[in-house]
Amino acid sequence: MFGWHWLLEWQTPYEFHGHLIEKVLAEEKTPYQHVTLVEFTRFGKGLIIDGKVQSTLYDEHIYHELLVHPLLLSLTKPPKSVLILGGGEGATLREVLKYKSVEKAVMVDIDEKVIEFAKKYLYEWHQGAFEDKRTNLVITDGLKFIKETKEKYDAIILDLTDPIKNSTSYMLYTKEFYEKLREILNERGGIVTQATSPSFSLEVYVTIYNTIKEVFKEASASYTYMASFDGLWGFVYGGVRPDLLSEDEVDSKINERIDGQLRFYDGYSHKISFSLPKNIKSEFQKITKISTEKDPIYVPA
């Protein structure tokens, strides 16, 4: 943070995105991370964790709809039980609860302060999802929860902070962690994770894909442009193949499975998001790294 007026968000060791801040709504250094809620001049309200923009009012719906819906629509049967790791703003939960079939949505977040801030300041994100009777909010470490849970889920959504060295999240992008997730998935279930930026950390994006494909055998990758992130943003899905859904299938399943409005995602945007450009697709042939506990992947900044 530069004074109280600018956030200088480093994208790589060589470049940053400067965000003008109108005012700081709340700020606290918790035992896990530095959490700040602000009003950006361009993007409106926004959540910052450890100097990284997590989401803004301007375009959070793009990120959260592309994170959630390709996974849940590509499941053979409409999902009944969904596990969310991270997603403290409540927007991922909001999208999950739009499914008529969902009976239980378990959301696990390590930092109670993020939830507290979200409930107070980010209603536009959660829209009351924390109070939905289908919601089970658990404040604990995600890895600890996965090791101890006895339940199985139709879908698991990883809305985590980036794999930054010495952070709370980087071990949640490894082969060993994905193997633990596979054990608590119901048959024909699937997972999705945010997969960082093809613009600034293409090797990380591809490595996450490689790692998920190694564990789940089936995998696909999507991307979209996020203005508040200053570039492309990626998502990787495992155990399912949303990339094989046609435009018409997506639109039909939205009508069948979802109760509520979507602002970004439909059959057309689905097709575009899974149509990776040639320069990115070529890297999937070149990069073979798998992220493991002994050799994890990190974003460059």
Swiss-Prot record:
The keyword Secreted does not apply. It comes from the Archaea. It catalyses: S-adenosyl 3-(methylsulfanyl)propylamine + putrescine = S-methyl-5'-thioadenosine + spermidine + H(+); S-adenosyl 3-(methylsulfanyl)propylamine + propane-1,3-diamine = norspermidine + S-methyl-5'-thioadenosine + H(+); norspermidine + S-adenosyl 3-(methylsulfanyl)propylamine = norspermine + S-methyl-5'-thioadenosine + H(+); S-adenosyl 3-(methylsulfanyl)propylamine + spermidine = thermospermine + S-methyl-5'-thioadenosine + H(+). It is found in: Cytoplasm. The active site is at 159 (proton acceptor). One of its GO terms (molecular function) is sym-norspermidine synthase activity. Residues 4-240 form the PABS domain. InterPro entries: PABS, PABS_CS, SAM-dependent_MTases_sf, Spermi_synthase, Spermidine_synt_N, Spermidine_synt_N_sf. Pfam families: Spermine_synt_N (PF17284), Spermine_synth (PF01564). Optimum pH is 7.5 with one-half of the maximal activity at pH 6 and 9.5. Keywords: Cytoplasm, Polyamine biosynthesis, Spermidine biosynthesis, Transferase. Its EC number is 2.5.1.23, 2.5.1.126, 2.5.1.16, 2.5.1.79. Coiled coil: none annotated. Competitively inhibited by 5-methylthioadenosine, 5-methylthiotubercidin, S-adenosyl(5)-3-thiopropylamine and S-adenosyl-3-thio-l,8-diaminooctane. One of its GO terms (cellular component) is cytoplasm. Homotrimer. Involved in the biosynthesis of polyamines which are thought to support the growth of thermophilic microorganisms under high-temperature conditions. It seems that long-chain and branched-chain of polyamines effectively stabilize DNA and RNA, respectively. Catalyzes the irreversible transfer of a propylamine group from the amino donor S-adenosylmethioninamine (decarboxy-AdoMet) to various amine acceptors such as putrescine (1,4-diaminobutane), 1,3-diaminopropane, sym-norspermidine and spermidine. NCBIfam families: PRK00811.1. This is Polyamine aminopropyltransferase. The gene is speE.
